[in-house]
A protein has these predicted regions:
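ALDH superfamily catalytic-core signature
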Residues: 233-378, 402, 441, 488-492
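Structural signal for hydrophobic packing residues in well-ordered secondary-structure cores
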Residues: 58, 62, 77-84, 88, ...
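Hydrophobic face of amphipathic alpha-helices that form TPR/SEL1-like repeat modules
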Residues: 1-31, 356
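Residue-level signal for inorganic ion chemistry
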Residues: 33, 69, 91, 114, ...
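Short, well-ordered beta-strand elements within core beta-sheets of diverse protein domains
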Residues: 36-42, 57-63, 149, 259-262, ...
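Conserved C-terminal structural/oligomerization subdomain of aldehyde/semialdehyde dehydrogenase
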Residues: 34-38, 260, 314, 341, ...
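Glycine-rich loop-to-alpha-helix module at the N-terminal edge of alpha/beta enzyme cores
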Residues: 34-124, 134
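Rossmann-like NAD(P) dinucleotide-binding subdomain of oxidoreductase/dehydrogenase enzymes
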Residues: 81, 126-269, 398
Length: 493
């Protein structure tokens, strides 16, 4: 195995530096829990340095020609694509994602996102509002300012592009707090950004712990907006922390996606799509189809096929190109997912498959959990209501459309959901009434840089991607011009 190229310092003002107090944290390979690197840990003073650098860089970056900003973002996309082998290896070692996924999905989706937003700076159009005679009223969109971004550990590289792309395109400068579990690919992106010519202070990366660096970034009076992806519990803390200067907040939080299989669905397609919905990335996805709802007429037939497919998924070394499922990203998270397997049994549920660490001796040192399928006792069970965030799917059955719609919406979350049917009317009616920011029909977990991504209810607010994201990172400015209006004298003398 070749050794990937990466940095371990904080990235502030275009330099990799140690934290001011010399603090570091350990980064582990979840395949065998071996030490990958010691990375500088950002504390409050380091966040202050990064915010100051971003604040200093903001006026010139915001004033730069939009097309020039786009050229730089495009160059970053090209550099990431050129670094594909290195970045995919780095992401696999850091996260446990199988190399086939990091190479073909994570890196290439990152490239596609930066390329999309490379074309957006000069398309951030304003409007002219028809107002009273004699006046011209035009509205421009201006950058928010210094943006704090908190990136999660489940897709660190891809989410770096989701947040950096629109923020930079809109003319903002950024301080990004990467998760302590998986900081390496984001630091590499920062290094590539410097190489292609991004000015000092435009991009700053401060890896660290959420309760220290993340909390302080959300509180910081020098930050104008915070964008957070992570748990709902932490999202609430972000909102509270941001109140000091009433900064704008964008949240993409937890999910408990309903994946509904109707009696007229193409079962083979639904089986494969449903397995992808929950087992891709070891189930560590906020949009995972973690509640599998089967029409009672096809439940047994579907389950027979689904269980056979799930049992055949190849767990192994994520560097092996034939591996289909790698480890969870940390030992702590492995223990959490295994804990839900115990909860399922305590609640009277039936574990139909998995629920344990694989018996293969080669996998014992890692953070593996077998693909797990559970039949719940009621939809009010914890395993049906709480986000597990692992290769753990709960199965239930339904009789008709009205019942399954009620089941699907019986959750605090509202991020994504899917349904499989050949009935066009049913498909659109269900999509209309499902309480989710995204609905997939005869597919699951599809997204594109131009399509809005985000949720409702306890899954947060605001949107990633597309023109919607550009609006998240800009403010409308209304300008009134008196051309030849006859304004009455208000104080006649």
């Amino acid at each position: 195995m070749s050794t990937p190229k990466f940095q371990t310092g904080l990235f502030i003002n275009n330099e990799f530096v140690d934290s001011l107090d010399g603090s570091t944290f350990d980064v582990f390979n979840p395949y065998d829990n071996s030490l990958l690197a010691k990375v500088s840990e950002a504390k409050k003073a380091d966040v202050d340095r990064a915010v100051a650098a971003a604040r200093k860089a903001f006026p010139a970056w915001a004033a730069m020609s939009p097309s020039d900003r786009g050229v730089l973002i495009g160059k970053l996309a090209d550099a990431i694509e050129k670094d594909r082998d290195n970045l995919s290896l780095l992401e696999t070692l850091d996260t446990g994602h199988p190399i086939r996924d990091t190479r073909n999905l994570d890196v290439m989706r990152t490239v596609a996102t930066f390329r999309y937003f490379a074309g957006m700076p000069d398309k951030n159009e304003g409007t002219v509002i028809p107002v009273d005679a004699g006046f011209l009223n035009y509205v421009t969109r201006v950058p928010v300012g210094v943006v704090g971004q908190v990136v999660p550990w489940n897709f660190p590289l891809m989410f770096t592009s989701w947040k950096l792309g629109p923020a930079l395109a809109a003319g903002n400068t950024v301080v990004m707090k990467q998760a302590e579990l998986t900081p390496l690919s984001t630091l590499r992106v920062a290094e590539l950004a410097r190489e292609v010519g991004f000015p000092a202070g435009v991009i700053n990366v401060v890896p660290g712990y959420g309760h220290i660096a993340g909390q302080y970034l959300a509180e910081h009076m020098g930050v104008d907006k915070v964008s957070f992806t992570g748990s709902t519990m932490t999202g609430r803390k972000i909102v509270q922390a941001s109140a000091g200067n009433l900064k704008r907040v964008q949240l993409e939080l937890g999910g408990k996606g309903a994946n509904i299989i109707f009696e007229d669905a193409n079962l083979d397609a639904a089986v494969n799509g449903s397995a992808f919905a929950i087992f891709h990335n070891q189930g560590q996805a906020c949009i995972a189809g973690s509640r599998l709802m089967l029409h009672e007429k096809i439940a047994d037939q579907f389950l027979d096929k689904f269980l056979k497919l799930a049992a055949s998924i190849k767990l192994g070394n994520p560097l092996d190109p034939t591996t289909e499922m790698g480890p969870l990203t940390s030992k702590m998270h492995q223990e959490r997912v295994l804990g839900f397997c115990k909860v399922a049994q305590e609640e009277g549920g039936e574990i139909l498959l998995g629920g344990k660490i694989p018996s293969n001796p080669e996998l014992q040192k890692g953070c593996f959990v077998e693909p797990t399928v559970v039949r719940s006792k009621t939809i009010k069970d914890r395993v049906c209501q709480e986000e597990v965030f692992g290769p753990f799917v709960v199965v239930s059955t339904f009789k008709d459309d009205a019942e399954v719609l009620e089941m699907a919406n019986n959750t605090i979350y509202g991020l994504g959901g899917g349904l499989w049917t050949n009935n066009l009317q049913r498909a659109h009616l269900m999509a209309r009434h499902m309480e989710a920011g995204m609905v997939w029909i005869n597919c699951y977990k599809r997204f594109h840089p131009g399509s809005p991504f985000g949720g409702i209810k306890d899954s947060g607010y605001g949107r990633e991607m597309g023109h919607f994201a550009m609006h998240e990172y800009t403010e409308p400015k209304s300008v009134w011009v008196n051309i030849d209006a006859k304004i009455p004298v208000f104080y006649p003398r």
